[in-house]
């Protein structure tokens, strides 16, 4: 892997960093939290600015209003969002939704949905968790939701999904389902583009660790037109696998940004906090704890970017993604615990920004597979490889 950025990628990194740093302040986040309704905090002004700067469609093709760059460019935007804990659904829209439509969608689907993403007019997400808490993962849980083919070529979807991020503000939700013929015969997996305002769709708000609400999505004989099935003649299982892989990697990148920011806050605090007439950063125990957190942060960053680089290059990345998610889950919680500990009482003060990184990291830890689940996935991959 080449760890240097191209000129275009460096420009994206700098632009995204500047916008997020300038617009996402502690005071702005507190304001959004205080004004949030049932849909949760959503910085629509920032969302528009990201669109105007061309960042929301940075990884989309130029024919739909994008910049024509790759998944790495999208991850640079996501990492900047993680560093500021911004209230914008960049992971959900750019990766859960737009990435699979860009890769597998028909020309009509791409033009219908991706132009709106690039313009900041469309929010997308995907429903990857079952009601019982099981997550649709490669080689793991199959979706319980069913899609029954109708005589006119349309589909009828029935089932329930849980913990769907950004569902309350989404314009469309990608829903994996077991496809069935009219006689009930299972014909394979499919991913369907569902309008959350369609008849038969019920959204129930779910509170989360971060305060960014998710939703239970209930589907009761929801009519989905023929062109609502993502792609044409594509392998549905492959689409589901791709969504999960890209989404998991994006969360690891988001985590890398959050942990880096938490560590920077900690470094600054320990340099200015004086005890026994010395900055506590000069104490050996403090330095050792911070050094351990730095090692974890670098491991999270490097493994996440390795996974992102392989995905962007079209290379197999299942084992790299499992390793990255393990580090994001296991290492991430160590980083934010160390950061909170080294801050003392300030670390748990909600008037101080550290708590947002703590909560974001803990939520990512258990999203799309915990550390143990990631190790199990890696074990299955290694066991299947010929010696």
Where do the model's predicted regions map?
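A glycine-biased, small/acidic residue-tolerant capping/turn segment at secondary-structure junctions
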Residues: 309, 317, 332-358
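A short core secondary-structure module
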Residues: 127, 154, 158-201
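Internal helix-loop-helix
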Residues: 51-111, 115-120, 164-172
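Glycine-rich phosphate/cofactor-binding loops in nucleotide/flavin-utilizing enzymes
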Residues: 2, 13, 45, 76, ...
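Amphipathic, small/basic residue-rich leader segments at the start of a protein or domain
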Residues: 1-88, 380-387
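A short, Trp-centered hydrophobic/proline-enriched beta-strand micro-motif
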Residues: 120-131
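C-terminal helix-coil-helix/basic helical segment that borders enzyme active sites and/or dimer interfaces
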Residues: 28-38, 267, 271-279, 294-327, ...
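Glycine-rich beta->alpha junctions and the first turn(s) of the following alpha-helix
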Residues: 2-8, 12-15, 83, 201-298, ...
């Amino acid at each position: 892997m080449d760890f240097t950025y191209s000129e275009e990628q460096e420009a994206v990194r700098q632009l995204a960093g500047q916008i997020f740093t300038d617009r996402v302040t502690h005071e702005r986040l507190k304001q959004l939290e205080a004004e949030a309704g049932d849909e949760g905090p959503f910085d629509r002004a920032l969302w528009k600015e990201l669109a105007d700067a061309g960042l929301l469609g940075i990884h989309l093709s130029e024919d739909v209003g994008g910049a024509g760059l790759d998944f790495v460019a999208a991850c640079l935007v996501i990492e900047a969002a993680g560093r500021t804990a911004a209230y914008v659904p960049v992971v959900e829209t750019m990766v859960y939704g737009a990435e699979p439509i860009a890769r597998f969608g028909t020309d009509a689907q791409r033009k219908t949905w991706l132009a709106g993403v690039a313009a900041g007019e469309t929010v997308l997400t995907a429903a990857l968790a079952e009601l019982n808490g099981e997550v649709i993962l490669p080689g793991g849980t199959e979706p319980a939701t069913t899609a029954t083919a109708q005589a006119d070529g349309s589909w009828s979807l029935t089932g329930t999904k849980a913990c769907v991020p950004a569902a309350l503000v989404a314009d469309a939700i990608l829903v994996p389902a077991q496809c069935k013929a009219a006689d009930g015969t299972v014909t394979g997996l499919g991913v369907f583009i569902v309008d959350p305002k369609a008849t038969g769709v019920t959204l129930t708000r779910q509170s989360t660790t971060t305060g960014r609400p998710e939703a239970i999505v209930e589907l009761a004989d929801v009519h989905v037109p023929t062109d609502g099935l993502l792609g044409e003649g594509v392998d549905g299982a492959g689409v589901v696998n791709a969504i999960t892989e890209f989404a998991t990697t994006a969360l690891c990148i988001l985590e890398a940004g959050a942990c880096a920011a938490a560590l920077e806050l900690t470094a600054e605090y320990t340099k200015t906090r004086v005890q026994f007439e010395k900055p506590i950063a000069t104490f050996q125990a403090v330095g050792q704890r911070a050094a351990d957190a730095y090692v974890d942060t670098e491991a999270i960053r490097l493994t996440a970017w390795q996974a992102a680089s392989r995905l962007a290059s079209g290379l197999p990345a299942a084992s790299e993604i499992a390793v990255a998610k393990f580090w994001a889950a296991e290492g991430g919680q160590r980083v934010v615990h160390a950061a909170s500990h080294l801050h003392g009482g300030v670390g748990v003060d909600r008037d101080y920004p550290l708590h947002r990184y703590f909560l974001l990291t803990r939520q990512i830890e258990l999203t799309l597979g915990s550390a143990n689940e990631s190790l199990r996935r890696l074990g299955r991959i290694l066991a299947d490889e010929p010696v």
